[in-house]
UniProtKB/Swiss-Prot annotation:
The record marks H121, Q341 as: Interaction with tRNA. InterPro entries: MnmA-like (IPR004506), MnmA-like_C (IPR046885), MnmA-like_central (IPR046884), MnmA-like_central_sf (IPR023382), Rossmann-like_a/b/a_fold (IPR014729). It is found in: Cytoplasm. This is tRNA-specific 2-thiouridylase MnmA. GO terms for molecular function: ATP binding; tRNA binding; tRNA-uridine 2-sulfurtransferase activity. GO terms for biological process: tRNA wobble position uridine thiolation. ATP binds at G6, L7, S8, G9, G10, V11, D12, S13, M32, G120. It catalyses: S-sulfanyl-L-cysteinyl-[protein] + uridine(34) in tRNA + AH2 + ATP = 2-thiouridine(34) in tRNA + L-cysteinyl-[protein] + A + AMP + diphosphate + H(+). Pfam families: tRNA_Me_trans, tRNA_Me_trans_C, tRNA_Me_trans_M. It comes from Treponema denticola (strain ATCC 35405 / DSM 14222 / CIP 103919 / JCM 8153 / KCTC 15104). Keywords: ATP-binding, Cytoplasm, Disulfide bond, Nucleotide-binding, RNA-binding, Transferase, tRNA processing, tRNA-binding. Belongs to the MnmA/TRMU family. Its EC number is 2.8.1.13.
Amino acid sequence: MKVLVGLSGGVDSAVAAKLLIDQGYDVTGVTMQLLPKLSGIYKEQTDDIEDAKKVADKLGIKHIVYDMRETFKTEIIDYFVEEYKQGRTPNPCFICNSKIKFGLFLEQALKDGFDKIATGHYAKIEKTEIEGDERFLLRQAEDAQKDQSYFLALLTQEQLSRSIFPLGDFTKEKVRSIAEDAGLINAHRPDSQDICFVPDDDYTRVINALAAGSFKEGKFIDTMGNEIGRHKGLQYYTIGQRRGLAIAMGYPVYVVKKDAKTNTVTVGKDEELFAESLIASRVNIILKKTIDKEIDIEVKTRYRQQKKKAKLIPLKNEEFKPTGKFKVEFIEPEKAVAEGQAAVFYTGDYIIGGGIIESVERLGIL
């Protein structure tokens, strides 16, 4: 079987390639060239491509480069900026996995004669049959600290059926040990912690460089709608933020809502950060073909958080037909839920599906 492995230049993808070689697959390495050449705005990718080439040489496999810069710019970077314009806080990695890393990448791999693709993601794929329907299920990785299934919840059945995650049963420590034993140059390379195209995790720098004219100063308001100050622009704030507000209220205040239509930022007390429910759109269901009635789930609205108990309710239109949107009702109010982020639904360590948080019903906000 011919497998095209995405080599990012990091240790995880390098070990994924090595494991597949050891298992007898016909492996080729590819690096997705994603970042446009705009000096001073985006991160540089040159070193990553060079490191990936060195890894491929060490493993004795061919290395190629897929130039995806144009599509990445329109589908991910432009999306990222537009979401901020709309007052939301996007998760570009969530969209990128669906459209680029397992979308465009898979399409090109199949055109080039490969049977499957593989990456260094920490997650598991399980083939099974549910109610007479063959399904490819997505599960959390063994290493809970490194599990990345949250970012993969938009993957379709076709994408899952054509993908391999060799690291699903490995800890990060074991991966580094394998890389060291194999003499790979990136065995101790630090993990990437931020969005791939954002230097130093400085979102506003990228947004201001690409769309500074789209943002204006506006009003800070309290949860009753009273003006209490002036903000610098919506791009500087995110739900739950406390620092940098420059508001003296006599008690700590946090960003609890952003409204692009009125160009206002609502601030409130800690208890006003909590949400009763959310509406998720662009929902993808993995566990079964459809969900047509309310079910009990666990949900994550941020990557680094514990799963929380909730009800998942499919929404229907006036003709009682599915809208593709779902309501999530938290059993206990959830803190700092942000529009634009990913909501991912779980049962045990299986991913039911996920979508984009479209709206949030917060406690005590007009």
